[in-house]
Amino acid sequence: VDAAIEAGAKFIVSPGLNPKTVKYCQEKNIPILPGVATASEIEQALELGLDVVKFFPAEVNGGLPAIKALSAPYHMMQFMPTGGVNPQNVKEYLSFDKVLACGGTWMVKDALINAGEFDKIKEMTREAIELVTE
């Protein structure tokens, strides 16, 4: 967490819900979106004072139907699905009012970052924005 903050991160996203990490981020006043996939993990997130979580891995855990089902009893929670989100399903996810944002490795590949191909990353980012604003 400290390395991310020192590098300029404005928020933290993690694959799972670690209460120690959440509390540390809260002490540092940095928003955190821990990964959850079950009602029990959402209960933990609520207990920690969170109202936005990463739903991960989204497609493996039922995708948008699962988010909708979890949203019924946890109407105060918002979700950021990642894991299996792609150009074909991102608009469907974003059409649900409990989905705050989506993440996907299809938008920025490690190889492009490592190669310093930031113009290509900019182009892919523009394409992703166009995809969801059509």
Question: Where do the PLM segments sit?
Answer:
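Catalytic beta/alpha-barrel core
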Residues: V1-D2, G8-L17, P31-T38, I42, ...
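Aromatic/hydrophobic pocket-lining residues that form π-stacking "cages" and hydrophobic walls in ligand
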Residues: T21, C25, E41
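A contiguous pocket-lining binding segment that forms or flanks enzyme active sites
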Residues: G49-K54, A66-L70, H75-M76
